[in-house]
Regions:
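Basic/aromatic-enriched alpha-helical hairpins
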Residues: 2-72
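Short, basic (Lys/Arg/His-rich) helix/loop patches that form interaction surfaces
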Residues: 133-135, 229-270
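Active-site/catalytic core of tyrosine-dependent DNA strand-transfer enzymes
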Residues: 187-242
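Catalytic-site neighborhood detector that most strongly recognizes the C-terminal catalytic loop/helix
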Residues: 117, 175-179, 272-297
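DNA/chromatin major-groove-contacting recognition/catalytic segments
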Residues: 183-188, 196-197, 285-306
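N-terminal DNA-binding recognition helix of tyrosine site-specific recombinases/integrases
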Residues: 42, 71-104, 153
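Short, polar N-cap/turn motifs at the start of nucleic acid-interacting alpha helices
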Residues: 164-172, 241-243, 263-284, 306
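Basic, Lys/Arg- and aromatic-enriched nucleic-acid-binding interface segment
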Residues: 103-155
Length: 306
């Protein structure tokens, strides 16, 4: 009987997925946990079942699932997000080198969406906004500008950025999403923003989070991200920007401006993701820290010129 149970669990896609989700949760990658759980629930609704065998996840099954999502009125971005999460789970469960997977030809791209970047003139308008010192709007503006100055650093990495990650004139941290080590030389513009919060008696650089460990920290981060995006909408109106700011816009803005200033594409790839993660990794490995520092210095001088 025990052997039968073990065989059943081994063949259960849902059971294996839960094992992976538990492992990811133990690594405190709560956003990934949320994505995996949401995608898995969606798949089970399509299958009208509480469990699925690994063998039942075929290319036809995945194709049918994506068609079902479309008929449910789910956006292409969400379909892509669900599919990427399920593919990641499947690959961890059933990965075999050189073997095609049911997700090989599934849609996992990014359709054309609303404009995701702003111009240098918009950044200058933000910089010139007169805001009350110590206000939440002033903090949100500082964070947005800081993200831009730091190669489009994601909000989550800024929120959790610790003072001990700054030393010898450089910010060194690991991206929470990819675990890649990032090294950012501290230019004068970056130093100025950090200095505004140097008196805060806390381990984090910015007074954004009140919780820093475990599930509570993730919940706090989600609340603060929502507040931050609300503040960015307010700042957009105050600065009379034609494009509404969002937290996700910073990295695209850095990449777009860098490209316009003839920064090499392989350098820009460190700020923008690729459809193929392997391609991104190849580009990242080829980036010299000095190249990156010089590219960022040129860009910051261009944006902050009077």
């Amino acid at each position: 009987m025990k052997k039968e149970v073990e065989t059943t669990l081994k063949e259960s896609f849902v059971y294996q997925a839960q094992v992976i989700i538990s492992r990811v949760r133990s690594e405190e990658r709560y956003n990934t946990v949320k994505n995996y759980e949401t995608a898995l629930r969606s798949l089970l609704r399509y299958a009208e079942a509480s469990d699925l065998s690994i063998r039942s996840i075929t290319a036809d099954f995945v194709r049918g699932y994506q068609q079902w999502l479309k008929h449910q009125g789910i956006s292409l971005n969400t379909i892509s997000c669900y599919t990427r999460s399920l593919r990641a789970i499947y690959n961890k469960v059933q990965w075999r080198k050189g073997k095609a997977t049911p997700f090989e030809h599934a849609y996992t791209g990014s359709p054309e969406t609303a404009k995701r970047s702003i111009q240098a003139t918009d950044m200058r308008k933000l910089l010139k906004l007169q805001l009350p010192v110590g206000s939440r709007l002033a903090l949100s503006r500082d964070v947005f500008i800081f993200c831009f100055y730091c190669l489009g650093m994601p909000f989550i990495d800024v929120a959790f950025l610790r003072r001990n990650q700054i030393s010898n004139g450089c910010i060194t941290y690991y991206r929470r999403k990819t675990h890649q080590a990032i090294h950012i030389p501290i230019e004068p513009q970056i130093k100025e923003i950090i200095a505004r919060y140097r008196h805060a008696q806390r381990e984090l650089v910015f007074p954004i989070l009140t919780q820093t460990q475990g599930v509570d920290a993730y919940s706090d981060y989600r609340r603060k991200l929502s507040q931050y995006n609300y503040d960015l909408r307010q700042l957009s109106q105050m600065a009379k920007l034609k494009t509404r700011l969002t937290s996700y816009m910073v990295r695209h803005t850095w990449a777009s401006m860098a490209y316009e200033r003839q920064v090499d594409l392989h350098v820009i790839s460190k700020a923008l993701g690729h459809d193929n993660p392997q391609t991104t990794l190849v580009y990242i490995r080829g980036i010299n820290n000095r190249q990156l520092a010089n590219a960022n210095r040129r860009l910051l001088k261009f944006v902050t010129k009077s």
